[in-house]
C-alpha cells in the first residue's frame, strides 16, 4: 500500500492552509515555498480540492485560498477522495469473485489485507484537518 505524492501533498498543503486560514487567504506560492512543493503541482491539486468544495479561491491582490468548511469538518478521507487517492491493500476488487492472484478464489491472506484496508480507512475517516494542525502545533512548542 502506498499513498502517492498527490495525496500526501494535498494533506500537507491543507494543513499549511488551515494554520493561516483565519488571517487571510493563503496563496499557493506561499504554501509552495513553505512546504517545498512545486507550484504547478499545487495548482493541479487545488483545482481538484476546489472542484470538490474542500477549498475556495479568493480573487484579488490579497487573494488565495481558504477552507470551504471548518478544519474539524474536513476528514482525511474527504481530502483523499477529492484528489482521487485510494487506499488499496488488496489487488482484487471488493465485489469480484476472482482473487488478486487471478484465480477463482481469494488468496490465503486476502482477509488480512482487507481488514488492514478497513482499519486504515476508518483511521482516515476519524482524523480531521484540525487534528493535524493541533498535532503540528503541539510538536512545535
Where do the model's predicted regions map?
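C-terminal regulatory/oligomerization modules of transcriptional regulators
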Residues: 76, 92-141
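Basic amphipathic alpha-helical segments that dock to polyanions
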Residues: 45-50
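A short alpha-helical element within helix-turn-helix/winged-helix DNA-binding domains
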Residues: 26-36
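Key DNA-contact positions within bacterial/archaeal DNA-binding proteins
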Residues: 40
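The C-terminal cap of the DNA-recognition helix in HTH/winged-HTH DNA-binding domains
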Residues: 19-22, 33, 51
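Beta-hairpin "wing" of winged helix-turn-helix
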Residues: 54-62, 66-67
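Short amphipathic alpha-helical interface segments
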Residues: 10-22
Amino acid at each position: 500500500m502506498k499513498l502517492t505524492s498527490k495525496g500526501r501533498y494535498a494533506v500537507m498543503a491543507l494543513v499549511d492552509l488551515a494554520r493561516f486560514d483565519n488571517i487571510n487567504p493563503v496563496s499557493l506560492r506561499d504554501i509552495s515555498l513553505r512546504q517545498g512543493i512545486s507550484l504547478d503541482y499545487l495548482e493541479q491539486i487545488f483545482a481538484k480540492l476546489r472542484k470538490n468544495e474542500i477549498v475556495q479561491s479568493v480573487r484579488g491582490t490579497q487573494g488565495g485560498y481558504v477552507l470551504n468548511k471548518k478544519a474539524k469538518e474536513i476528514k482525511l478521507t474527504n481530502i483523499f477522495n477529492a484528489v482521487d487517492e485510494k487506499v488499496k491493500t488488496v489487488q482484487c476488487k471488493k465485489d469480484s469473485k476472482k482473487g488478486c492472484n487471478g484465480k477463482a478464489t481469494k488468496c490465503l491472506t486476502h482477509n488480512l489485507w482487507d481488514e488492514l484496508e478497513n482499519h486504515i480507512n476508518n483511521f482516515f475517516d476519524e482524523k480531521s484537518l484540525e487534528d493535524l494542525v493541533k498535532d503540528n502545533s503541539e510538536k512545535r512548542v
